[in-house]
């Protein structure tokens, strides 16, 4: 047991399973077979807030470097690969322009507006990493200014203040206004999840209650989508962020009671979720262009295409994880020191 009331375990199998299903939900959304699948991003952000609250106090001034080692290598590799395709085979991509300015901004996690009028870096899913990097920067600064155990809570407060400013007085269309979107509050929900689990009330609630809470949280997302459609701005925090927070609290509570996912495939996909997340739009596009796979759950051929595409996405993401992502991170850790 750590001195903050949390168990000393460094790995939560249920969180890894949540990562797997969150990544697959986003994949299914981009396959146009799961209209609420983008809620996987909300789950990722809450997980990030929880995990950073877990690791930041022990990492101190090494926190930001460790986050860079974990996030940057694969993102840069995929970004450079997409840029090369945009230069050599632009017809393979839809809205990606091979401008050096866009490459530099993408590599530095600086948001920009593309020719189609949408915000987004060269890697289509890199927009979420811009918010992740903002959170990491604020946490790293907080570790310098406040006690380590309060750093993520202070960072969440700063992001909430930034979000409030963007909503009240921000200038639409600016980078600051874009980064101040309400979705950044979900990192704070992850911090709340961590603080709730610190209180010790977890052990006073029976296991079936936590299972029920997790099921209700998962069901709340498609239910809210069926009733209200895709929520925007602050409504998204209430309708998708809060259930994601309840889900993470429930899953970690179950881990703490040794009720954990033992499915090796799910845990492996969770470990590969970052690779799956960054690669899948291009794997889906390639499956469409090369094999003519058009996912559609309303027809048998479309259902088979959906299963085949999902399988190819999972396999390519897993291979990328074990052949590219993990070796790069390990090599950097050997040179720079261990990373969490």
Spans of model-derived segments:
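Alpha-helical transmembrane segments in multi-pass integral membrane proteins
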Residues: 1-15, 21-37, 53-62, 112-121, ...
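Hydrophobic residues within alpha-helical transmembrane segments
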Residues: 17, 21-24, 40, 68, ...
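Flexible, solvent-exposed coil segments and beta strand-coil junctions
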Residues: 27, 166-169
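Short, solvent-exposed turn/loop segments enriched in Gly/Ser/Thr/Pro and often Arg
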Residues: 39-40, 84
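Structured binding elements
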Residues: 44
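Membrane-interface helix-loop-helix regions
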Residues: 47, 53, 65, 71-133, ...
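Conserved functional loop/turn residues at catalytic and ligand-binding sites
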Residues: 67, 327
